[in-house]
């Protein structure tokens, strides 16, 4: 038998999708699986936070997502990673469980029935909605996006628990997202600049400034991350709040070589992620 690995999702392929499927919101916290009385990350390393271990280590075989704060908050990845990947502290963390890994050959619906919520202790079973057609899936996705989540997870009701990544053809575990996200290594930094060039008005009445470098003034904080993408690089300069821009720039040496999680839309004409936006720093123990 292959060694245990968490089951991971692949992007869904509409042409391969077979109904009915079970659908739920895509959670974007920190993956957690309880094995041998230890809460483990996706990489099967212990979650560092003592409070997390104290609260959830008794939930043997539960597989789910740790969430700090609200599960549909736009900053949930950052707040969750910050809370559960440090040893000390008692973050406002909940465990949203969606699978049970004791018997990997058992059907998903049977494994799901083994899960139990414990609202008093912040343990919640993720509801699964049966979807019977592409029309129903599109309606469910619209509702999920309107509530603030960023995608949908799909499961075959008869799926086993696969050790590793499910394929689109298998359909055991799939994700429906209109954008992509991935982790990229930080290989450089660009400083944010203030454009002191004289403002002029275009023929359309819009204000514009020259991009002449001589009149650009360094602002002493991050303008963009330079990220590795295969044999090339690309820049990501959006998605940061003010504190992150200042902190990352001040501690560039510490962040160099770490991985940034980036949201992006397909690929541009230069074959690099298009319109990238920063989601957070991804702890290597959760990769």
Task: List each model region and its residues.
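Covalent nucleotidyltransferase
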Residues: 14-124
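Nucleic-acid 5′ end/cap handling module spanning
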Residues: 2-46, 103, 123-272, 276-285
